[in-house]
Regions:
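Flexible hinge/capping segments at coil-to-helix
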Residues: 24-28, 125-140, 226-231
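Pocket-flanking alpha-helical
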Residues: 44-50, 70-107, 119-133, 175-180, ...
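Short, low-complexity disordered leader/linker segments with a strong preference
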Residues: 1-33, 318
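Ligand-binding cleft/hinge of the Venus flytrap
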Residues: 49-65, 150-169, 200-201, 257
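Pocket-lining segment of extracytoplasmic ligand-binding domains
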Residues: 96, 166-260
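Extracytoplasmic "Venus flytrap"
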Residues: 28-52, 146
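Secondary-structure end/capping motifs
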Residues: 41, 228-303
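A local structural motif
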Residues: 22-34, 59-71, 86-88, 159-171, ...
Length: 318
């Protein structure tokens, strides 16, 4: 992963339009729009439901606040846009990307855990001779650098007694890595979510998943400046997140039917994948330990130079 762009601009969305939310006890700076990412892969059920059912729009339209979704899936691209003031919330950001961005000076806070899904992150191959991570030695492996998937590769190689230097790692996005695997130009690929399931159904085999290697933590992050100016908006945003999870838990079949159509899987495939995920928002002690381990991984593999205090990255509700 290349270094983050450190341009910090004025936050998008501020205007002179007033807010009619009578619940705020302190006068806050007026706002006309909220900008957040929309990342539906690997299987981000809450985000899909929130967009399809316009849950954020319904919450903030009462105050004439527009909600704009931006389909930016790359962690570095998300954090660069946040730093430039183009985004307010990063809704499904890899823990790796959050830590690297913070270490490079991007002013963000982690609001909550978005998901944990060690089984959802996989190394796949079409090469019958590759049965385990040890068999990857000397092989071409494609995938996105500095991500949870990359962390799975490094951890799997380490467990087998090897390092990344023992493979020919090619940095590319999941769609490109999937195509490269199908074309035979690489021996293995780092793939997640529905794309992985489709590849398996097409004949690819699993070398390993992240289970027992990483927790696969994805987080929701916010611009620190935005959070300081609009703590009421942040609180309401998190309330929508909580209400979304309650709806999904109370109406699982209905929710997963919507999701299956969006991601192009059968309902049975969607249910299978959903069972791999933990979408609970609370940041647990185990999550904090995993984020610390992630930082150690990033520093050890020279993807992060400046160590950060993970506890300082966690947002404190005003």
């Amino acid at each position: 992963m290349t270094a983050m762009v450190l341009v910090v601009g004025m936050l998008a969305g501020c205007s002179n339009k007033g807010s009619s939310d009578g619940s705020t006890s302190t006068k806050k700076e007026d706002i006309s729009e909220i900008n957040l990412t929309y990342v539906k892969a690997p299987l981000n059920v809450p985000s899909i439901i929130q967009k399809q059912d316009d849950l954020f729009g319904k919450e903030f339209s009462k105050d004439n606040i527009a909600v704009n979704f931006h389909e930016i899936t790359s962690g570095p691209d998300q954090t660069q846009a946040l730093a430039a003031g183009e985004l307010d919330f990063l809704h499904a950001l890899g823990g790796t990307s959050a830590i690297i961005a913070a270490s490079n000076g991007v002013d963000l806070k982690i609001l909550n855990t978005y998901s944990r899904s060690p089984k959802g992150f996989m190394i796949l191959t079409n090469n019958d001779s590759i049965k385990s991570a040890a068999d990857l030695k000397g092989k071409k492996v494609a995938g996105p650098k500095g991500t949870v998937l990359h962390q799975v590769l490094i951890a799997a190689l380490d467990k087998a007694g090897f390092t990344e230097n023992d493979v020919e790692f090619i940095n590319m996005g999941i769609p490109e890595a999937t195509s490269a695997l199908a074309e035979g130009s690489v021996d293995a690929a780092l793939i997640a979510g529905p794309t992985a399931l489709k590849a398996i159904n097409a004949g690819s085999t699993v070398v390993t998943t992240g289970e027992g290697l990483v927790d696969g933590i994805i987080v929701t992050a916010v611009s620190t400046k935005f959070a300081e100016k609009h703590p009421d908006i942040v609180k309401r945003f998190m309330n929508v997140e909580k209400e979304t999870l309650k709806y999904i838990n109370d109406n699982k079949d209905e929710a997963l039917e919507k999701v299956s159509k969006e991601v192009g899987l059968t309902i049975d495939q969607t249910k299978e994948m959903y069972s791999w995920y933990d979408f609970s928002m609370d940041i647990t002690d185990k999550d904090m330990e995993e984020l610390e381990k992630t930082q150690d991984f990033l520093i050890k593999n020279e993807m992060q130079e400046n160590k950060v205090n993970i506890k300082d990255l966690i947002y404190t509700q005003k």
